[in-house]
């Protein structure tokens, strides 16, 4: 542990505490309407296969670093998507489908967000187009295809895939 504490990476204070920014939970939450948060919780917790992700107490690390508590939020089993981003894209698909009905959803992504959107679309039986840059790995593309998404590889970087997504989405 002593070697880790002396390492260059560890000495960067923002790794543990960003002294230039103080997190104000109430201010951040004031930008999200409470009813929206309540709606998301109610919707997501009703999805088949939902369970709260466990918090794992890292007591040995607590003791070594002198902190009262350190927890690890284990998202590994979140709808088998293994990502903390698994909820946002799928919830957006759910919300839009509730308002618009039978639609095709589309997004640009480099990976996890696209998997979430594809999973949400598959769950609701919707068509899904995922635009990725040429630099996204075939493994990531295949993971989205396995969720029935039409994966479109675009020459260029993420911004190019986003522009193509917007362009294609405007077509009827």
Q: Language-model segments: what does each one mean?
A:
Residues 1-172:
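PLP-dependent amino-acid enzyme catalytic core
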């Amino acid at each position: 542990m002593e070697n880790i504490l002396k390492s260059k990476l560890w000495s960067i204070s923002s790794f543990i505490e960003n002294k230039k920014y103080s997190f104000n939970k109430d201010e951040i939450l004031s930008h999200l309407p409470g009813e929206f948060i309540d709606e998301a919780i109610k919707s997501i917790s009703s999805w088949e296969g939902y369970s709260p992700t466990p918090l794992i107490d890292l007591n040995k690390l607590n003791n070594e670093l002198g902190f009262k508590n350190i927890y690890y939020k284990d998202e590994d089993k979140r709808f088998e998507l293994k990502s903390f981003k698994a909820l946002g894209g799928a919830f957006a698909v759910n919300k839009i489908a509730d308002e618009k009905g039978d639609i095709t959803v589309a997004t640009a992504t480099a990976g996890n967000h696209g998997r979430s959107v594809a999973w949400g679309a598959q769950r609701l039986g919707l068509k899904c187009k995922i635009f990725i840059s040429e630099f996204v790995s075939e493994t990531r593309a295949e993971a989205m295809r396995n969720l029935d998404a039409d994966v479109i590889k675009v020459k260029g970087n993420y911004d190019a895939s986003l522009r193509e997504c917007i362009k294609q989405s405007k077509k009827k």
